[in-house]
């Protein structure tokens, strides 16, 4: 039986003169962690951990009415007008601070119809009180699909939303989404955290790591709106869904608030976001595969590809040179296996990318590598992630 994955869609309403077009974000590929701009990796599986936290269930006080009452004044509708006949788009966003900064998805206020991603010609913000004002784009981060906007706050009673913490999320925790699905402003949907630490495609060929999966209904126009916890704090921004039909099927994804904080800080400082880059694609090692290959480790990231002239290539890392299908999964074997990064073990498929993302371009990491049955220490000076 052949298993295929459904397409994912970024949820804005996009208008042209005649038709409504949904912006499709194809899957980043099947696979483990990828830091190259190649998306041919195996389907990622996620290892769930359960932190010791108090889960916010209904009996602990999850009140959708209260969440909506507290958060909805800070949720806005965003309309973008694009250059060169690119039409217009509608999405959602939220007020970040009293100075008039607003957060949304980058794909709500940018367009790639001309071959490169460019900011919209005009952006307008509509508040719940029906005021509509122009906004400027401070910057956008295509890697995290985050954009920072700015309005002049004078004369407006802004309601900034509080930012939460996605590090202690647990599966089953109730959440709420507010936005403008199909242009229906100030719409609330509720659900639960279906999974954490997902990897989803960004506006580049790299992945957004740590994404939150939810069954809260997300539809066209929800993009950029907040995903909220029981305290009406922002856990993420609703970004895309996985579907066969183009309509909501209960598998939605939000960019985590930790990624939003990082993007916003860089966009405020320099108008763009930079990420460290190593230049490899990996596939996860697990006990049965390790036994099959005779590896002296039951975990790690097996290098299926090393991008030419990348930091990994310059450090001498080697990718796979042979193909093997094992337990119905194709592998590129024969390359190095990264066991740890700066002493942190690489266990889950996204661990390598997650560790690299905590660094800045120009910093050096030490990898423990399994090569030809021997363990070696390899230092890699990280580069700047390319946008292409």
Regions found by a protein language model. Give the residues of each.
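Nucleotide-binding motor/catalytic cores of P-loop/tubulin-like NTPases across gene-expression machines
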Residues: 307-310, 339
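Conserved PDZ fold ligand-binding element
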Residues: 102-103, 314-349
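Bacterial N-terminal signal peptides that target proteins for export
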Residues: 4-18
